[in-house]
Amino acid sequence: MLLIGVAGTELSAQERDWLQHDAVAGVVLFKRNFASRTQVAELSAAIRAAAPRPVLICVDQEGGRVQRFREGFSALAPLQSFGAQYAQDPEAALAAARAHAQLMASEVRASGVDLSFAPVVDLGRGNRAIGDRAFSDEPQIVATFTRAYVQALHGAGMAATLKHFPGHGTVLEDTHVDHASDPRPLEVLQAEDLVPFVAGIEAGADAVMMAHVVYPQVAPEPAGYSQRWIEQILRGQMGFRGVVFSDDIGMAASFSAGGVAGRVHAHLDAGCDVVLVCHPELVAESLQAVQGRSLNTAALIGLIGRGALGWDGLLAGTDASFTTPLSAHFGTTA
C-alpha cells in the first residue's frame, strides 16, 4: 500500500484518479496543503469523497518546528520541553505531555485528518533531523513519556505511531539529505534506543515508522529495507502486531535501493505495510511499480479515526475523549 502526497490545497484531476487506485491507502498532508482550518477540512472531505474505499489521512503535527498546520491551531511545544521540565517536576511534565497529545490529536481530528505521525521516540543525542523533537537523551525517560503520550492519543481517539525505528537519535546525519550509519551492536541498541519502542508497544501503539538508517552490525541495508529489523526483531522478538510505515522514499538515505520502483519494492519485500510517497512527482511511478503485487488492503482500517470531532465540539470542550481541560495547559493558537 502507498500513502501519497498531493501538490496543493485542492485536489487536481490527476490526484483524484490516483485515489481510485487499489494501492493507495491514503494521503499525507504537508504545509503546502494547508491554508486554513476550513480549507484543510474541505480538502480532507474531498480526499475521502474521491476514494472508493476508506482512506487514511495523515500529517506530521508534532509541535515545535514540525507542525504543518499553524494558523488557527494551537502553537504546540517541541517534545524536548517536557523532558527538560521532567528533571524539576516529573508529574507536571507528564501531565503537560498528555495534554499536548490530547490537544494535538483533537485539533487534527477536528480537521478531518485521522492521525499525526507521533510520538517521536528517538533519543535526543544530537541528530540534526531530530533535535528538539525528542523528549530526552535518556532511554527510560523517553520510555516514560512514550507510554503517557500513547495513552493520551488513544484517549483523544487517535492511533499512535512510534518513530523512527529502531532509533534515529544517535547518528548525526539527517537522512532527508544524507546517508546515515550507526555502528553500534544490537545489544547496545536494545539497551538504549529500543527501550522507548518496547514501552510504546506495551502501551498499545498502533503503528511504527521505520528509519532510513543502516545498522551494519545488525543488517547491511537501511532498517526500512531490512527483514531482519522488521520481521525478525520488531515483529518476532518485540511482538509488534500493528502497521509498519516506511519513511518517505524521496529522502536521500532511501536511494540505496535504486530508483523509485526499487525503493517501493525493497520496503514491501522487507515487511513494510505502507510506503510513504510524499512527493507527488514520484506517485505515478510508484503506482506502476505495485501493479500486480498482493497488497494488504485492510492493514490501515484500525488507524482511521472514529470520525472528525468538529471544531464546534472541540472549542466547547464537550467531547467525551477529554480527560483534562485543555485550558489547564494550553490556551493560545498560532
Swiss-Prot record:
Chief site of localization: cytoplasm
SUPFAM superfamilies recorded: (Trans)glycosidases
Matching Pfam families: Glyco_hydro_3 (PF00933)
Residues the UniProt record annotates as site (Important for catalytic activity): D174
Subcellular location as annotated: Cytoplasm
Cytoplasm listed as a keyword: yes
Enzyme Commission number(s) from the entry: 3.2.1.52
Keyword Oxidoreductase tagged: no
UniProt-annotated binding residues for substrate: D60, R68, R133, K163, H164
A GO CC term assigned to this protein in UniProt: cytoplasm
Record's catalysed reaction(s): Hydrolysis of terminal non-reducing N-acetyl-D-hexosamine residues in N-acetyl-beta-D-hexosaminides
Protein's GO biological process: carbohydrate metabolic process; cell division; cell wall organization; peptidoglycan biosynthetic process; peptidoglycan turnover; regulation of cell shape
Family note: Belongs to the glycosyl hydrolase 3 family. NagZ subfamily.
The protein's role, per its UniProt record: Plays a role in peptidoglycan recycling by cleaving the terminal beta-1,4-linked N-acetylglucosamine (GlcNAc) from peptide-linked peptidoglycan fragments, giving rise to free GlcNAc, anhydro-N-acetylmuramic acid and anhydro-N-acetylmuramic acid-linked peptides.
The protein, known as: Beta-hexosaminidase
Gene: nagZ
